[in-house]
Amino acid sequence: LLMGVDTGSGSREDPWAGNSDTMILVTVNPQTKETTMTSLERDILTNITSDGETVQAKLNSAYAQGGAKLAIKTIQDLLNIHIDRYVMINMKGLVQLVDKVGGITVNNPFDFDISIEENEPEYTAKIAPGRQEINGDQALVYSRMRYQDPEGDYGRQKRQREVIKKIVEKVLSLNSLSHYKGIIESVSDNMQTNISLDSNSLLQLLGYKDALSTIHQYQLKGEDATLADGGSYQIVTSKHLLKIQNIIRKALGKKEIKTLKTNAYLLDGDEELKNSSSSKNDTPVATSEEAPVYQEYNQLPVVPSTQDTGVVTPQSSVAPVTPVAPAATESSS
């Protein structure tokens, strides 16, 4: 799981106190030599369970409530998949990372400069239209702009995946252990991970190089909804969420599932797709695969496990909030 936290730069001095506004689930399969990146919409309405209490809230608030551990658990429940490793970086870390690899090349598809200065005056970098070589400050702006994008946050997420892909390509082109160590050291104060990043692990990462050369990109989307609390949320449909779950499972070599298990609040409440055990208020029951959520690793595996991790155990649900006139069409990946 890749998480970007909206802190650590400009006036947001605390490096980790904020929301995980970027959440991308990455699968790397050295057997198929393919990688997937699935962006998760930050405003998806989910049931977040912590210390025995469940609240309905936006997906990105799980990190603010309980740090990386709760964020991982919540996303694990959302997608009904075990997540064993994570990398989290804040805004300053992204700037440092892009600068350390010597900048990246992106394509601004708009006929105007990409800028966030109007809403965030402390960030003055701009990206001109067309193909551009950009530095770290520009990469941060390129990854954060959404108000001028016709696709809003979904457009921003596309650019975030583009930036990650370009960074990966640049890092792999270096093909040097000393370069890798230097890159990691440069962002160490602004990155958190449960992956050991010693020399042995970095050498093992080279074994994933072929898989990282082919990256497929997906997007978990929802429908716009204004709820009783006045907040704007994204609410997923059963069919779309099940499709995304199976895309991820296929990438990991797991069997396709027919029954949706999730902690998301569903727009349609499709009884044929969702977990057969639901509350009297018709709120989906949150579930997760039985496996450790958060743990330290001494080294990377040579080949990721493709085995299912066990029986799905339901958690408690909460009373639903009725959406007001949400769109009825299903989002596509």
Q: Which sequence ranges carry the predicted segments?
A:
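Non-catalytic, solvent-exposed segments at the cell envelope interface
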Residues: 1-333
